[in-house]
Every structure is written in structure tokens, then in C-alpha cells.
A protein has these predicted regions:
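An accessory alpha-helical subdomain
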Residues: 66, 70-135
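Short, surface-exposed, charge-dense and proline/glycine-enriched linear segments
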Residues: 9-13, 54-58, 75-87
Length: 135
């Protein structure tokens, strides 16, 4: 299940959360919106793990309610604890995604129909962040 779906389930079930729970989440993509929801709902990310099996990456996020917490855009994008640990799987994942995003940006330039500038700028920003991360 993707991070957006997990976020929506958590948001719709807020009344059932008692403020004492530890959330152990495994989004298949969409980690940014899930981390964003956690931050805006007072959950601190206390554990992150990235596993690589076959050709897939699996991310596990553990969060606990702590009250207000603040993360930068890059921390939300990469994972605050992942940024600190920079495991071999983490570096490999972002090297792979950098290549994919560069191909995407190049295909935008060749597209017959114009791509919204917002989308182009978003991909370019992500490429910049990943490049900075890997250097």
C-alpha cells in the first residue's frame, strides 16, 4: 500500500488514535506525503529502515506521538534518520532514482506536448537534492 493511502487511512481514523501508539508503517512509495502527515500530526520518526530485496526497495518507518515536530523538505523527502545513516541500500536507491529522474526530465524536453512548468521544476529540484546527497 502506498504512503498516500496509509496517510489517508490514518487521517480518517484519527479518532481511534489515542496518542500512545507506536506506528510501524511500510509504504510502497509515497513516503514524502506520509512523513508530512506524521510531522503535522505530532509524530516523531523514531526509526527508519530501508531494505533491498531483488530489485525492490522496502522502507519501514516507525513513529511515535511526541507533540510538535519539524522536519525540512529534504528530511521529509529522504527520511530524517535515513539521511543520517546513509546505508549502502539508501545510497543505491537514490543513485537509481537519480538516473530515473534524469531520464524523465530529458523525456520532458522531447515531449510533443508541453509539460507543466511546476512538474518540470519539481523533478529538477529533486535531481538537485539527490545530486547534493550523493556528492
Amino acid at each position: 500500500m502506498g504512503g498516500e493511502t496509509i496517510r489517508d487511512i490514518l487521517d480518517n481514523g484519527k479518532a481511534r488514535l489515542n496518542g500512545q501508539e507506536r506506528l510501524v508503517l511500510q509504504p510502497n512509495g509515497g513516503e514524502y506525503p506520509l512523513r508530512h502527515w506524521l510531522m503535522h500530526n505530532g509524530y516523531r520518526i523514531v526509526g527508519e529502515e530501508l531494505l533491498h530485496e531483488n530489485r525492490f526497495y522496502y522502507e519501514i518507518i516507525v513513529a511515535e506521538p511526541t507533540g510538535p515536530v519539524s522536519y525540512t523538505e529534504q528530511q521529509l523527502y529522504f527520511g530524517p534518520l535515513q539521511l543520517l545513516a546513509r546505508s549502502p541500500a539508501f545510497v543505491a536507491k537514490w543513485q537509481r532514482l537519480l538516473q530515473q529522474k534524469q531520464k524523465t526530465l530529458a523525456s520532458f524536453e522531447k515531449a510533443r506536448q508541453s509539460v507543466p512548468e511546476e512538474k518540470v521544476h519539481g523533478i529538477a529540484r529533486e535531481i538537485q537534492w539527490i545530486t547534493q546527497l550523493l556528492t
